[in-house]
């Protein structure tokens, strides 16, 4: 279960890098520039209300469950999007461990739009080149980390390791452009799915070590064929519903999964039957009464702006919905510790 979750997180990174890059490139080609202010403001409006509310709920629970469940140091790491580096340094985020992947994503989004806006003066090829350079650096770091015997959590939770699938997704989006889904031979797609299944089947410690590389390869081989998926599936109301609420579901699944796994030692099937329904209900409630009302309020910071890529944030969270429920068990990094 945890191996599948680790693979799911890596695939989410790849999907996220692909989608946000495609949206940024589309905005640049439409407007001749990327509205960075709109991008960052809209991300804050989309992400922070639910995150703050979920951390507040965990803090209240921590008052009864004790410091093993919650501390204010954990909350600070989550709110500042430094959770992954807290785990790399050996600290335990307990019920907020799942926020490490949000930290990785936001660190990427802090720098990548700036870089895309600059290098797009040279066209999509320049974006592919820069992303490819980042992938090469990431692979070099990965080989070095394995060679020197770095701990698994140093590889899995680090920004360097997670950059591989993120940049691979970004490079794929820039390379695809207006190319047909058949630009890459379909047999490559089968290799990509094979890598995904292999990662999910391997022992968990092996999976988390090689996940940055295997998921990056899978993203490069599978994503170019995404457009060939049946339209009714991609446009289904159920997928859109889960996509819009997947971020909240992910936030609420994490504390439940940690408590049931680490404290009560529930089996995976018991967690699946309990955590997923509870997360869906709480996530749906959060989206309806916290996120949606906040997003409907006009922001003075977004007046007189060009149409930004961040307007399509629901397209991004739709991708999150493909992995959010399966990824939760793997977020508890200490569960893999000796």
Predicted segments, located by residue:
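Functionally critical transmembrane alpha-helices in membrane proteins and complexes, commonly lining
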Residues: 1-26, 45-51, 73, 80-83, ...
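Interfacial loop-to-helix transition and helix-capping segments at the boundaries
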Residues: 1-9, 67-77, 91-104, 146-168, ...
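Alpha-helical transmembrane segments of multi-pass integral membrane proteins
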Residues: 6, 166, 170-171, 190-292
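Membrane-interfacial alpha-helical segments at the cytosolic side of multi-pass membrane proteins
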Residues: 20-22, 54-60, 108-121, 168-175, ...
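Structural signal for the C-terminal ends of transmembrane alpha-helices
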Residues: 21-29, 61-64, 117-123, 171-180, ...
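Transmembrane alpha-helical segments and their boundary/interface "anchor" motifs
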Residues: 26-62, 77, 101-110, 134, ...
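Solvent-exposed interhelical
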Residues: 106-136, 173-190
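Membrane-proximal cytoplasmic C-terminal regulatory module of class A 7TM GPCRs
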Residues: 236-238, 292-321
């Amino acid at each position: 279960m945890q191996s599948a979750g680790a693979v799911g997180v890596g695939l989410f990174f790849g999907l996220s890098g692909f989608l946000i890059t495609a949206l940024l490139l589309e905005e640049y080609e439409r407007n001749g520039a990327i509205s960075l202010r709109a991008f960052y403001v809209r991300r804050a409006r989309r992400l922070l209300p639910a995150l703050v509310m979920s951390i507040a709920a965990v803090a209240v629970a921590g008052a009864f469950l004790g410091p093993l469940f919650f501390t204010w140091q954990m909350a600070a790491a989550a709110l500042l999007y430094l959770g992954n580096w807290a785990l790399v340094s050996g600290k335990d985020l307990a019920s907020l461990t799942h926020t490490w992947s949000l930290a990785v994503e936001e660190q990427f989004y802090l720098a990548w739009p700036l870089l895309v806006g600059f290098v797009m003066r040279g066209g999509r090829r320049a974006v592919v080149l820069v992303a490819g350079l980042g992938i090469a650096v990431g692979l070099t770091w990965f080989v070095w980390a394995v060679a020197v015997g770095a701990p698994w959590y140093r590889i899995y939770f680090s920004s360097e390791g997670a950059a591989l699938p993120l940049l691979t997704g970004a490079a794929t989006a820039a390379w695809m452009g207006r190319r047909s889904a058949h630009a890459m031979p379909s047999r490559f797609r089968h290799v990509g799915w094979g890598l995904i299944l292999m990662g999910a089947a391997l022992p968990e410690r092996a999976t988390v070590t090689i996940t940055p590389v295997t998921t990056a390869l899978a993203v490069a081989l599978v994503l170019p064929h995404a457009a060939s998926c049946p339209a009714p599936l991609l446009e289904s109301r159920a997928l859109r519903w889960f996509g819009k609420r997947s971020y909240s579901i992910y936030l609420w699944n994490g504390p439940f999964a940690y408590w049931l796994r680490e404290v009560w030692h529930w089996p995976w099937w018991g967690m699946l039957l309990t955590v997923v329904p509870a997360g869906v209900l709480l996530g749906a409630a959060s989206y309806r009464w916290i996120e949606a009302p906040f997003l409907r309020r006009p922001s003075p910071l977004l007046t007189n702006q060009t149409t930004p890529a961040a307007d399509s944030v629901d397209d991004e969270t739709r991708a999150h919905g493909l992995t959010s429920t399966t990824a939760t068990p793997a977020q508890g990094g200490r569960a893999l510790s000796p």
